[in-house]
From Swiss-Prot:
Transmembrane regions listed in the UniProt entry: none
Organism: Arabidopsis thaliana (Mouse-ear cress)
Positions of the F-box domain: 2-49
SUPFAM superfamilies: F-box domain
Name by which UniProt lists this protein: F-box protein At5g41720
Pfam families in alphabetical order: F-box
InterPro entries for the chain: F-box-like_dom_sf, F-box_dom, SCF_F-box_component
Organism phylogeny: Eukaryota, Viridiplantae, Streptophyta, Embryophyta, Tracheophyta
Length: 187
């Protein structure tokens, strides 16, 4: 016969500190105490260190003077030795912007708009800043202007993802009064 014993939260938090962020939600559902202690800064710092993760915000903005795209990472923890997100490991491009991200896997979708002749042709790059890995993906057909871009990671090992691109068809409102958009799905 099994005896009911209280959970040892210190042991449980130690195990959780090695888990990826995608598994944290499952542990937080175990109890209110486990959920509360997993948001304490001592646990967050230990988890970030052990999983080589970042905690913070990515701000995306456009420079009105030079019409360039910029992104800035603001750390959510006050650590001096923690590296900030840096996209300098990407191939030398002129105007890289972060279009979408998957926060569970730490994956970013970056776009660099390059003028080839008189046309703007985007280069799409899927990257993981924590490991400095990137993959330049083939350009989709960009007949229409991009309205929105989304990224969904299917699996991290092997690395599989889907990118959805919503574009404007120039036919703003159809005969039925509906706003027309096109979507492209590529992997």
């Amino acid at each position: 016969m099994m005896m009911n014993s209280p959970l040892d939260y210190d042991v449980l938090l130690e195990i959780m500190s090695y888990c990826p962020a995608t598994e944290m939600a499952k542990f937080r559902l175990l109890s209110k105490e486990c959920n509360k202690r997993s948001y304490e800064m001592s646990f967050i710092n230990r988890h970030l260190h052990r999983t080589n993760s970042f905690l913070g915000y990515i701000f995306y903005y456009k420079d009105n003077k030079w019409f360039r795209n910029h992104s800035c990472f603001v750390s959510g923890v006050d650590e001096k030795d923690k590296n900030r997100i840096n996209l300098a490991f990407l191939p030398p491009l002129c105007n890289v912007s972060i279009e979408a991200c998957d926060t569970h896997h730490g994956i970013l979708l970056c776009v660099d708009v390059v003028f080839k002749g008189r046309q703007k042709i985007p280069d799409y790059i899927v990257c993981k800043p924590a490991t400095k890995q990137y993959r330049i993906i083939p350009n989709p057909k960009t007949r229409f202007g991009t309205v929105a871009t989304g990224l969904m990671v299917i699996s991290s090992n092997p690395f599989r993802y889907k990118i959805i691109r919503v574009s404007d068809t120039w036919a703003r409102v159809g005969r039925d009064g509906v706003y027309n958009l096109r979507e492209s799905l590529f992997e």
